[in-house]
């Protein structure tokens, strides 16, 4: 906050790092599997790690597959993506007990980008073309209804040729525009 030269937070190769809410510890992902390579098992598995801040690294997950995208729920638990049950779903990991449990069980497509709200205990994530939420303590996942107001699909200005029946003609003071009514509709022309 006071400024100065940036310093390296940790020297392990990794990505998707998130600091713990209390500021002591960085959860991150190590591994080189492309996220699009579903079902990979091998040496490049993506696993969750914790850098404690005092130089110690702790491997958090040891699933023979990919664990990815950690997000802190509170100071002692994370949510993350895992394909432990086939498709990628949201799981919760308790750092104190080591317990891992599923928060979602979607079958059709992989879940993407889970993010926990530390204050509200809510996890939001993307599934197909929608945003979903689930309670960090566990609940039935809920698809959010998002209505986005949009512009009209067509231009409201319509060009037509008016024939017989024009009435109520008025010309602008500078003589560049003329307005008139045909069958109860107002028309403006140059």
Regions found by a protein language model. Give the residues of each.
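Structural signature of eukaryotic scaffold interfaces centered on beta-propeller domains
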Residues: 20, 115-117, 160-172
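Short, basic/low-complexity N-terminal boundary segments at the transition from targeting/disordered tails
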Residues: 95-99, 104-117
């Amino acid at each position: 906050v006071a400024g100065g030269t940036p310093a390296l937070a940790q020297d392990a190769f990794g990505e998707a790092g998130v600091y713990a809410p209390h500021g002591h510890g960085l959860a991150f992902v190590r591994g080189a599997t492309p996220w699009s390579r579903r079902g990979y098992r091998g040496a490049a598995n993506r696993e969750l790690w914790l850098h404690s801040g005092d130089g110690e690294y702790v491997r958090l997950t040891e699933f023979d597959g990919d664990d990815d995208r950690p997000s802190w729920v509170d100071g002692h638990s994370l949510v993350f993506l895992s394909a432990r049950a086939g498709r990628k779903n949201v799981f919760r990991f308790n750092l104190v007990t080591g317990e891992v449990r599923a928060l979602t069980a979607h079958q059709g497509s992989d879940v993407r980008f889970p993010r926990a709200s530390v204050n509200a205990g809510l996890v939001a994530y993307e599934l197909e073309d929608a945003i979903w939420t689930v309670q960090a303590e566990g609940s039935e996942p809920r698809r959010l209804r998002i209505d986005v107001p949009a512009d009209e699909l067509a231009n409201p200005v319509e060009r037509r040729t008016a024939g017989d029946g024009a009435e109520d003609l008025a010309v602008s003071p500078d003589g560049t525009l003329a307005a008139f009514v045909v069958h109860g509709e107002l028309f403006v022309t140059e």
